Amino acid sequence: MTRPDPIRSALFQISRPIFVTMRSGGPLFSHALPAHVSTQGEPSGPIPFDAFAPAVPLSLLGDRTFTARHHLKYPYVAGAMANGISSTQMVQTMAENGMIGFFGAGGLSLPEIEHAVVTLTSRLNDAPFGFNLIHSPADPDLETGTVQLYLKYGIRRISAAAFMRMTPALVYYRVKGIHQENDGRVTAPNQVIAKVSR
């Protein structure tokens, strides 16, 4: 019988197809079509494998609208963990590899956030990345100051966390710069992605 490790290994190689054939000793896994199966025309008899899963490249997982909207290669988001745990290096690595990372600005002072903003904007230019905006009900000035900082440096994506309702700062970020294109479409350049925690 096939041990679990080869099964797991075969299943985790999602960029390759997998063929499963049942044998008396258990299932056999292969990433190649059995050699005696023709790839031309219709099969003349029963297909000599019991199950098949096609290759699924990482770039095809998830919502294609999301990847197009944010100019991503892969539909993956990482970060927005508070106190800079989601570091500038992590955000940069995600952006340089076709994914999106959010810097974890929650719990940091405005000068610390500004340092991270300057670092990432100088390194990444138009690459996809963003910053966290955490709701601060006990300190609305911090929330407003963070938004003003993001707008000052042209941060176009934020991950909004811990919001129980819309706040003036969050709404201001979203609508700042809203305009109508020549073709009549309304464009809001600042994007808000809601971070939902349980």
Model-derived regions: residue spans:
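Active-site entrance/lid segments in N-terminal catalytic domains of soluble metabolic enzymes
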Residues: 1-198
